[in-house]
Amino acid sequence: MTKDSLFSRPQKPVPPFEFNASVVEVFDDMLNRSVPCYRELIHRQAQLAAHFYQPKTRIYDLGCSTGNLDLAICSAMDAARPFELVGVDNSEPMLKVCRERMRETPPEANISFACSDIRNLEMSNASVIILNLTLQFIPPADRQNILNRIFQALVPGGILLLTEKTVHAHAGLSELQQDFYYRFKAENGYSQMEISQKREALENVLIPETMESHRKRLDQAGFKAVDTWLKWFNFASFIALKEKS
């Protein structure tokens, strides 16, 4: 695993963050050092995917990046249990790594990949859809339509697993959460310059919202059974169930 040092040198101006080949090379280290509870998140989501998967349906991983969750899902599925998994990302460098990692997958796994903007992706017959740290990079005006289409693509009894970086409606609590997040990154070896430059690079690229905004949007899409199953300061992971009629 290559260490993330993308922002270890002064950059003027700091370019906007993008998922290019340089980021892909260090992405796994970046995730482990920048996303609180990342390993637990992936481990439990894979178990949830295996639990809710219905025969002859699909699992979609929207924003699959380098395939960490997809590998975990393959491990979590019962032996000799056929399943279909579709990994989607709009970064071809990410998908290149993901495809390589998924070459030695179980024979019962039908795995495919699509290099696509999820706003244009056609989805259907899904029992599990995962949207990890992806919606936050989509313009807010487009987010409701994506969730509407996810709800329509799910079969009854299917689930959406949504993880996002969030902000708090209360300014003081939002600042507290940010401070503890930067403390977390510093404890994982990032310098103050790296933290500052990464924050600048993400400005207007990653646009977080409140948990209330996410819940309202999920409700409008049709999800009436929603829970926050994992939360760490300004990171939250939701499970949204499309109930059987």
Swiss-Prot record:
- Record function comment: Catalyzes the conversion of S-adenosyl-L-methionine (SAM) to carboxy-S-adenosyl-L-methionine (Cx-SAM).
Give binding positions for S-adenosyl-L-methionine: 38, 63-65, 89-90, 117-118, 132, 199
Q: Does the keyword Disulfide bond apply?
A: no
One of the entry's Gene Ontology molecular-function terms is:
S-adenosyl-L-methionine binding
Taxonomy, top ranks, is: Bacteria, Pseudomonadati, Thermodesulfobacteriota, Desulfuromonadia, Desulfuromonadales
**Assigned keywords, A-Z:** S-adenosyl-L-methionine, Transferase
- Species source reads Syntrophotalea carbinolica (strain DSM 2380 / NBRC 103641 / GraBd1)
Q: Which reaction does it catalyse?
A: prephenate + S-adenosyl-L-methionine = carboxy-S-adenosyl-L-methionine + 3-phenylpyruvate + H2O
CDD domains attached to this UniProt entry:
AdoMet_MTases (cd02440)
PANTHER family associated with the record = CARBOXY-S-ADENOSYL-L-METHIONINE SYNTHASE, TRANS-ACONITATE 2-METHYLTRANSFERASE-RELATED
Report the Gene3D superfamilies cross-referenced here.
Vaccinia Virus protein VP39
Under InterPro entries, the record lists:
CmoA (IPR005271), Methyltransf_25 (IPR041698), SAM-dependent_MTases_sf (IPR029063)
Kindly report, in one word, the top-level EC class recorded for this enzyme: transferase
Q: Which gene encodes it?
A: cmoA
Q: What is this protein called?
A: Carboxy-S-adenosyl-L-methionine synthase
Similarity field: Belongs to the class I-like SAM-binding methyltransferase superfamily. Cx-SAM synthase family.
Oligomeric form and interacting partners: Homodimer.
